[in-house]
Amino acid sequence: MAASTASHRPIKGILKNKTSTTSSMVASAEQPRGNVDEELSKKSQKWDEMNILATYHPADKDYGLMKIDEPSTPYHSMMGDDEDACSDTEATEAMAPDILARKLAAAEGLEPKYRIQEQESSGEEDSDLSPEEREKKRQFEMKRKLHYNEGLNIKLARQLISKDLHDDDEDEEMLETADGESMNTEESNQGSTPSDQQQNKLRSS
């Protein structure tokens, strides 16, 4: 009989039957409205944003960033604040040669603005440095000028290469002329007497 009762019972699954869900819906409809609000408030979450900010983003956290103390690279602005500076529209238009000549003559004695600004800023920066730091900064700026003066280095290299090539050409010409003279003296020596050969040797030396 135990076998027959087991076969009559339905196998229960993990999922709820439709009959159980409909009965729960009827029961929930009978509940007052206040209980539904309590259930919704239990399901929703409230975030304490200030606590999250204080925990994960504290004010003293540096995020792995560090301050690098190195001399600033000079920036030279090409556009000036005065009216003489060319704007984009002026640059595209053709300028009359006489106007250009007058502007060049007027600007001939003036120093570029970026150099004036550089001198002013360097004076302000050097005032708060110790003598050792000033010397270190001066050496750094000198090395930077030497390093970034590549155009001069290329010109010097070209001059050295051309000088070496010119010297090599002269050496080759001298060897060729010396070989030619020795061949000429040998040919003349073959057709002359021993006394003539001695005279030729005395003349050449």
From Swiss-Prot:
Region feature Disordered, mapped onto this chain: 1-44, 111-142, 163-205
InterPro entries the UniProt entry points to: PPI-2 (IPR007062)
Family designation: Belongs to the protein phosphatase inhibitor 2 family.
Compositionally skewed regions (Basic and acidic residues) per UniProt: 35-44, 131-142
Modified residues (N-acetylalanine): 2
UniProt keyword annotations, A-Z: Acetylation, Carbohydrate metabolism, Glycogen metabolism, Phosphoprotein, Protein phosphatase inhibitor
Listed Pfam families: IPP-2
GO biological process: generation of precursor metabolites and energy; glycogen metabolic process; intracellular signal transduction; regulation of signal transduction
Record note on quaternary structure: Heterodimer with PP1.
Keyword Phosphoprotein in annotation: yes
Modified residue annotations for Phosphoserine: 44, 87, 121-122, 127, 130
Domain of life (superkingdom): Eukaryota
Function per UniProt: Inhibitor of protein-phosphatase 1.
Residue stretches of biased makeup (Acidic residues): 121-130, 167-179
PANTHER family with a match to the protein in the record: PROTEIN PHOSPHATASE INHIBITOR, PROTEIN PHOSPHATASE INHIBITOR 2-RELATED
Region (Required for binding PPP1CC catalytic center, displacing metal ions and inhibition of PPP1CC catalytic activity) residue spans: 147-150
Protein name: Protein phosphatase inhibitor 2
Polar residues bias: start-end ranges: 17-26, 182-205
